[in-house]
Amino acid sequence: MTTPTAELGPLDGPLADALADLAARQAVGRLWNHDHTLWSPEPTEIVDRLGWLDVLDDMAAERGRIDDFVARLKRDGFTHCVVMGMGGSSLFPEVIARTFPTGRSGLDLQVVDSTDPAAVARALAAVPEDTTLFLASSKSGGTIETRSHLDFFWDQIGRPEQFAVVTDPGSDLGRLARERGFREVFENRADIGGRYSALSFFGMVPAALNGTDWFGLVERAREVVPSLRSADPAVNPGLWLGALLAAAVGARRDKLTLVLDPRVEAFGLWVEQLVAESTGKAGTGVVPVVDEPIGPADVYGPDRLV
């Protein structure tokens, strides 16, 4: 990999300083070693949120199970899937549904993340009740919106073979699914936060259900890992981009405008949450801007990074 091309102007100096600081702190190695002191001396809500760094091998080991799950659904005549979730449990499935057409081996995928009763009713009316899988996705298992969706669809359908869940080990949702005899319970590793769960069961099961080459996504991500472990910003695009965002915030450019190819514009929804929810915790953050009409350079204020 090579360093991205960028016109940084006044940010050249701050970027160099940010990269030097990260090098001095050995940030890349400490990140991959799950060293919470990179952020804070207090490990709470850090050490139990870094599992995304190691999830790719886990998912590769689950290939047979996921593919068999989808194949059995197709063999049993299923045609549609409704994913129930909020936030990180629904955004990446939404990206998948809006970016990739339903594959020949997949189901017609739609995501329900609205609390509007009319919207939920429309979602049910849009699918054939007898050949639709209802997938409830909640890390905690207690997300009130998702549990409400599940209660509604269960009351309407009531057949356990048409329900499955993705959740963390030991959650109430997992226990409920087993008590009712749901078709499948996918238990994610618990040390992955919702917004970082795209390449875990939370993202890859819906991708597989859509007929997307989910394992290809995992394999391509694995190919990038050696670059992301490098301390050289010319090799590691994640290091370079992270340093650039930090340099921009230091220069009071704290609005990140995302300009995306129309074919992947839905990806901005996931990036928006990832950036917005991952920063700002200590009074300093980045405000992502998505779906904004593109204008000439002079319409963007001095607080923008485009």
Question: Where are the model-predicted features located?
Answer:
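Alpha-helix capping and helix-loop boundary segments enriched in small/acidic/polar residues
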Residues: 111-118, 122-123, 137-144, 148, ...
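Short helix-loop-beta junction
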Residues: 96-107, 155-156, 274-285
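Gly/Ser/Thr-rich loops at beta-strand to alpha-helix junctions
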Residues: 82, 86-93, 139-146, 169-172, ...
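Glycine-rich oxoanion-binding loops at beta->alpha junctions
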Residues: 51-68, 93-137, 142-144, 290-297
